[in-house]
Amino acid sequence: YELLAFNERDLANLVSRTVIDNLDLVLSNDEHRQLNTLLLHAPDGRLRLRNLMPNFQPHYDLVVIDTQGARSVLLEMALLASQQAVSPVTPEILAARELRRGTLQLVEDITPYRKLGIEPPALQLLINRVPAVSSNARLIQQTLRLIFQEQASIQVLATEIPAIEAFPRAATRGLPVHRVEHRRPSGRQALAALEIVRGLANELCPQWQERFAAVTGKAGGRFAHVERP
């Protein structure tokens, strides 16, 4: 809240450390959900985070902004502050329609910021929770790829996230999924969670492929922990 409401720039007051070296978090403390209203009425509301990002750049190679999917001024602000945007979509007809009405419309609505020299990020669609066997899901996947194959500003990622039990299990345990499942279970067609996440990381950040290849998922199985400042 302090970052966006008061332009707080001291990282010691913003960042929470984790047990993983160089992996820090900025946790939301907007319990009363006041930021949406504040930013909506602020003259620089949608550009505030973009103007604050240089404060993080000397300290981090990558900043990931996790937002809610529902359209809001916070989501618009996050998009305008980003160089890449990843939107998950399930292979279901209702989700595909909502993608069209919501996310794609939002991307189109922020294009006028180009007149201010702000280039909206390219949108990358991640097909999520893909069932092992479903002709309908396969058809929707193929349709999504066909629709966007000639749109330079929208890419459907080659990596797909299958509907395997490892992902909810990892969330329940508070662990990265690649530490929960680094080998493919016998008899399952889908890749191991480690290989899936590595493939996604390689697509999103190809400059770090060698580092991703060195990740084995066999690190000590400690639960995720956040140390607040």
Q: What residue ranges belong to the model's regions?
A:
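P-loop NTP-binding core
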Residues: 1-229
